[in-house]
């Protein structure tokens, strides 16, 4: 058992900018603990001699010819933007200043 604490979940919630109740903190601590235990069980699997793979089945990625097509210039793309500065789109700030 990995024993994920309520305080560790509170720290993760703060980093994720989530407001969690005390009940949710305890509930998520138990759930995360269970997930960590399940994932750690993978490390106990006997895998000696098993070749590493990314998929259990072979995956074929079909290739296509690269075709040059007409695209917008930077000026054309920025022309429809509500705000632009120095060839870049300007968007509203969504995160704090990082002083936490």
Swiss-Prot record:
The keyword Protein biosynthesis applies. One of its GO terms (molecular function) is asparaginyl-tRNA synthase (glutamine-hydrolyzing) activity. It comes from the Bacteria. One of its GO terms (biological process) is regulation of translational fidelity. Keywords: ATP-binding, Ligase, Nucleotide-binding, Protein biosynthesis. It catalyses: L-glutamyl-tRNA(Gln) + L-glutamine + ATP + H2O = L-glutaminyl-tRNA(Gln) + L-glutamate + ADP + phosphate + H(+); L-aspartyl-tRNA(Asn) + L-glutamine + ATP + H2O = L-asparaginyl-tRNA(Asn) + L-glutamate + ADP + phosphate + 2 H(+). InterPro entries: Asp/Glu-ADT_sf_sub_c, GatC. The keyword ATP-binding applies. Its EC number is 6.3.5.-. It is an enzyme of class 6 (ligase). HAMAP family: GatC. Heterotrimer of A, B and C subunits. Allows the formation of correctly charged Asn-tRNA(Asn) or Gln-tRNA(Gln) through the transamidation of misacylated Asp-tRNA(Asn) or Glu-tRNA(Gln) in organisms which lack either or both of asparaginyl-tRNA or glutaminyl-tRNA synthetases. The reaction takes place in the presence of glutamine and ATP through an activated phospho-Asp-tRNA(Asn) or phospho-Glu-tRNA(Gln). Belongs to the GatC family. PANTHER family: GLUTAMYL-TRNA(GLN) AMIDOTRANSFERASE SUBUNIT C, MITOCHONDRIAL. This is Aspartyl/glutamyl-tRNA(Asn/Gln) amidotransferase subunit C. It comes from Corynebacterium aurimucosum (strain ATCC 700975 / DSM 44827 / CIP 107346 / CN-1).
